[in-house]
């Protein structure tokens, strides 16, 4: 029971953080537009990342696809962390690093979830 509860907490945290940012991406919030303009990816990148985060969040909650949603989350958050470290800076528009911290939090949750569900990956483990 403790493992299931811990897994649910990780799934919930990763998904809820990614889902709550969708509003800003899909409504073209000025902060979101600023970030993706700085990266040279506005508007295609903003909308594409939003769709990717939506799909990853949904897959994380389906037990058979948690591994794939986690893998997608790792990829998306690697991009976000890399953008913060190499182009944007940790603090963007005086957010005190909250976007960076959320990206790192989702990355850690997804990494642990991927490890916990590694036996569900069909091309790594054959099921009898």
Predicted stretch roles:
Residues 1-20, 64-128:
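Extended, low-polarity transmembrane helix blocks
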Residues 42, 61-64:
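Membrane-interface junctions
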Residues 2-51, 121:
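N-terminal first-folded block
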Residues 51-59:
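Hydrophobic, membrane-inserted alpha-helices
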């Amino acid at each position: 029971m403790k493992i299931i509860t811990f897994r649910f907490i990780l799934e919930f945290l990763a998904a809820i953080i990614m889902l709550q940012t969708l509003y800003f991406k899909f409504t073209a919030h000025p902060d979101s537009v600023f970030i993706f303009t700085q990266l040279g990816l506005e508007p295609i990148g903003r909308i594409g990342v939003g769709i990717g985060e939506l799909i990853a969040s949904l897959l994380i909650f389906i037990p058979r696809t948690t591994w794939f949603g986690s893998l997608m989350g790792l990829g998306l958050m690697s991009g976000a962390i890399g953008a913060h470290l190499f182009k944007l800076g940790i603090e963007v528009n005086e957010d005190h690093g909250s976007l960076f911290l959320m990206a790192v939090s989702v990355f850690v949750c997804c990494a642990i979830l991927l490890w916990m569900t590694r036996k569900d990956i069909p091309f790594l483990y054959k099921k009898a």
